[in-house]
Amino acid sequence: ARELPLVSLETYRPLHEFDVVGVSLQYELCYSNVLLNLDLGGVPLRSEARGDDDPIVLAGGPTCTHPEPLAPFVDAFLVGEAEEVLPDLLRTIGRMRREGRPRREVLAAMSQVPGVWIPSFYERGLDERTGMMVVTGRSAAGVEANAPERVTRIFVRDLDEFPFPSRFPLPYVEAVFDRASVEITRGCTEGCRFCQAGMIYRPVRERSPEKVVEAVLDGVDTAGFDSTSLTALSTADVSCIDPLIKTLVP
């Protein structure tokens, strides 16, 4: 009612003043919320309407394996697991923004990072066999930027190199799952054909038991929770689950 823009949690900075707006696409039903947040934050909805002073809208998460439904609204998708490439990617964006480089140059530099898909660098066409709109190749801008013809999903090879975060914002209200959570493995040994996560998070990788115990104790100590969930697609299939539980529950 007061036409106040959407602001950040920590600094109360309006969304449209950031260099990058990052969104995590966990489910397709979240797509409308992404557009609502951009609108409330004063960010032009369509990427083609954004100028050099507008933030880069960067999306990641599981549903980025099929990015096209949000392609008109997102400047760049990071397909796969972001831990290894995201810090350098953000530093590159920040440096180029400070130098006053045009938006197209920033996107061109981003397209050289493994796993980054820039929708505006590709063309679409109607597939006569399926009746669906599909990517047909690079656009003229994509060729000029030397964008890859195909973007490959990236993944972290060693989870222990990226400790699970234990310091995170606490909600003002009681959460549905009121406990700490630690990812102990990524990927799944079952390979069920109906399971998207089991396919896109291949190969199976496990954190070492020592790192898991360290993350559990750190999370409980910093967040004040008295219980922790060991998160995995199939926790019982983790190779070290028996000794891990015996260590955590004496």
Give, region by region, the residue ranges found by the protein language model:
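Short amphipathic alpha-helical segments, especially helix-boundary/capping motifs
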Residues: L9-P14, P62-H66, A145, F168-P169, ...
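Generic detector of short, locally flexible boundary/turn motifs and exposed helical patches
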Residues: V23-L25, G42-R46, D52, V143-V151, ...
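Ferredoxin-type iron-sulfur electron-transfer modules and their immediate structural context
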Residues: P119-E123, D127-G131, V135-S181
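Intrinsically disordered, low-complexity boundary segments flanking structured domains
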Residues: R101-A108, P148-E149, K246-V249
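Short, exposed beta-strand "edge-strand" segments with a Pro/Gly-rich flavor and a Y/T-containing core
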Residues: E10-Y12, E99-G100, E149-F155, R205-E206
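Surface-exposed loop/turn and secondary-structure junction residues enriched for glycine/proline
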Residues: S32, R46-E48, P67, F73, ...
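Radical SAM [4Fe-4S] cluster-binding motif and immediate context
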Residues: R157-P250
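Glycine-rich beta-alpha loop elements in corrinoid/cobalamin-binding modules
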Residues: R2-G142
